[in-house]
Design a protein with these regions (language model features):
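Extended catalytic/binding region for NAD+/ADP-ribose chemistry, centered on the ART fold
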Residues: 45-75
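Active-site and NAD+-binding cores of ADP-ribose-processing enzymes
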Residues: 1-40, 46-48, 71-185
């Protein structure tokens, strides 16, 4: 008997890590709540919005801005078009995170290093959606905008929320592109 398109996939061989009270960053349009998700939910590097909803976080302010500039550049918009923004500092505590944060870990599941473009997403989406189906809380990977020094975290929504992720205070409003982070050209 041959396996059909709906045949169960073998579980992915990935290492699990725990994040305990780690600081992560998220930028969003001014006026949105921290974990606001548009309807319909958007696609991201690690998922199609129709399959799984994810909240994307960055390991530093610099990585958050680099990812924002990457998205603007891909749409052909200058950096100033993406402001003002809110920058949220949040605390993340998750017990079961799939660690795909190195080239070696990505290769183990058939992925190459991420490139800063949407056309690179489909193989990552297949892996992310399988991890979601397997019950993982999140995927940790290299930032496509800063692969050598930045990390991104895609936290999957469960039960209409993002357990283990909380903003401890109000966001900081940023009215213009930060000078300390160079936009991607």
């Amino acid at each position: 008997m041959t396996a059909g398109p709906k045949a169960a996939l073998e579980p992915l061989a990935v290492d699990a890590i725990a994040l305990t009270a780690e600081t992560w960053w998220r930028h969003a349009r001014v006026g949105l709540r921290f974990a606001a998700v548009p309807t319909p939910p958007p696609d991201g590097r690690w998922q199609h919005g129709a399959v799984a909803v994810a909240l994307y976080l960055a390991d530093s302010e610099a990585t958050a801005w680099a990812e924002h500039y990457r998205a603007l550049a891909e749409r052909g918009l200058p950096p100033a078009e993406g402001f003002p923004r809110n920058l949220w500092r949040c605390v993340v505590s998750l017990a079961r995170v799939a660690d795909l944060s190195s080239v070696e870990r990505l290769a183990a599941v058939g992925l190459s290093a991420p490139r800063p473009m949407r056309s690179d997403w489909p193989p990552f989406q297949r892996i992310g959606e399988q991890l979601f189906a397997e019950g993982w809380a999140a995927v940790l990977g290299p930032s496509a905008a800063r692969p050598e020094e930045g990390r991104s975290l895609a936290v999957f929504r469960r039960d209409a929320g993002f357990p283990g992720v909380r903003p401890p205070r109000r966001p900081r409003r940023v009215n213009a592109p930060p000078e300390s982070v160079a936009p991607i050209s």
